[in-house]
Structures are given as structure tokens and as C-alpha cells.
């Protein structure tokens, strides 16, 4: 058990922060791809709204999933940090310095803050892109109604 705590103490921050960094890079790549696609898509080239929906909504789930799960990844880092703090308190003998405990707990909370920092832009981008998807769907419906009237 001691080896597990030593491993967590050495590598948990790297793992959690690395995972959040990876999530943010993936999210940004998907946002850029979606933005560029939605900016140039021509709804007139689609014969059905279902085909349009498939193209409009591609990668949107990834952006939403990252936004929804990043706080949980950060929370996992915080829980591990608090667990390690309690482990160190338990193995510290009888001397417990409150300032050291507070320092460790505050450092443990950085993972949650980073998770929220990834989640907020993800959800903002998701909602903004979702609006562009809806506008393109409405454009297709208007064109479809105009074709039906002709």
C-alpha cells in the first residue's frame, strides 16, 4: 500500500493535468474543425435534412462530453490530493502543522480548478456551435419549403 501512495504522490498531478491538457487540445481541435465547417457549409447541396444533420453534428458530442467530464477529472485529482494529505498526516507522527495541511489541501484543489477551466470554454463553444447548427438546419428548411412551392 505504501508503494501505491508513493506512486500517487509522485505521478498523480502529472496524470490529471496531462489528461486535462489532452482533453483541452482535443476540444480545441474539434471546435476549430466544426467552426470552419459550419462557416462554409452550403445547405443547398443536401437533399435531406438527415444527411445535413449528420454533417452538422459531427464531433459535437466530443465537445460536449469533454465539457461535461472535465470537472470530474479535476475532482478525481482533488480527491487523490486530499487522500495523500490524510496519508501524510497519518504517517507524520504526532506533530501536525495546520499550515502544512492547508498548503496540501490548497494544492489538491488546483485539479478541480483546472477541470472547471477546461469545462467552461467547452460548454460555451458547444452552445455557440449548436446555435450555428440550428441556423443551418433552419436555412435548409426554408430552401426546402421554397422548392416545394415552385
From Swiss-Prot:
TM segment ranges: 12-32, 66-86, 105-125
Q: List UniProt keywords, sorted A-Z.
A: Cell inner membrane, Cell membrane, Membrane, Protein transport, Transmembrane, Transmembrane helix, Transport
Job description of the protein = Involved in the TonB-dependent energy-dependent transport of various receptor-bound substrates. Protects ExbD from proteolytic degradation and functionally stabilizes TonB.
Q: What is its main location?
A: membrane
Q: Name one GO cellular component term.
A: plasma membrane
The identity of this protein, by name, is: Biopolymer transport protein ExbB
Membrane topology of the entry: Multi-pass membrane protein
Instruction: Kindly list any coiled-coil regions of this protein.
Output: none
Quote the InterPro entries the UniProt record gives: ExbB/TolQ_transport, MotA_ExbB_proton_chnl, TonB_ExbB_2
Can you tell which superkingdom this protein's organism belongs to?
A: Bacteria
Per the similarity annotation, which family is this? Answer: Belongs to the ExbB/TolQ family.
Give compartment(s).
Cell inner membrane
Q: What is the effect of changing residue 42 to N?
A: In strain: TN106
Q: Name one GO biological process term.
A: protein import
Subunit and partners: The accessory proteins ExbB and ExbD seem to form a complex with TonB.
Amino acid at each position: 500500500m505504501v508503494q501505491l501512495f508513493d506512486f500517487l504522490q509522485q505521478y498523480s498531478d502529472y496524470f490529471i493535468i496531462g489528461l486535462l491538457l489532452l482533453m483541452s487540445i482535443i476540444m480545441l481541435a474539434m471546435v476549430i474543425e466544426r467552426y470552419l465547417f459550419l462557416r462554409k457549409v452550403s445547405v443547398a447541396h443536401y437533399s435531406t435534412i438527415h444527411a445535413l444533420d449528420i454533417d452538422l453534428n459531427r464531433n459535437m458530442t466530443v465537445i460536449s462530453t469533454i465539457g461535461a467530464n472535465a470537472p470530474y477529472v479535476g475532482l478525481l485529482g482533488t480527491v487523490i490530493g486530499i487522500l495523500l494529505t490524510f496519508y501524510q498526516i497519518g504517517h507524520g507522527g504526532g506533530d501536525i502543522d495546520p499550515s502544512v495541511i492547508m498548503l496540501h489541501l490548497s494544492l489538491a484543489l488546483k485539479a478541480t480548478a483546472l477541470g472547471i477551466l477546461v469545462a467552461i470554454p467547452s460548454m460555451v463553444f458547444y452552445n455557440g456551435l449548436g446555435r450555428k447548427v440550428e441556423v443551418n438546419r433552419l436555412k435548409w428548411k426554408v430552401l426546402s419549403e421554397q422548392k416545394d412551392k415552385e
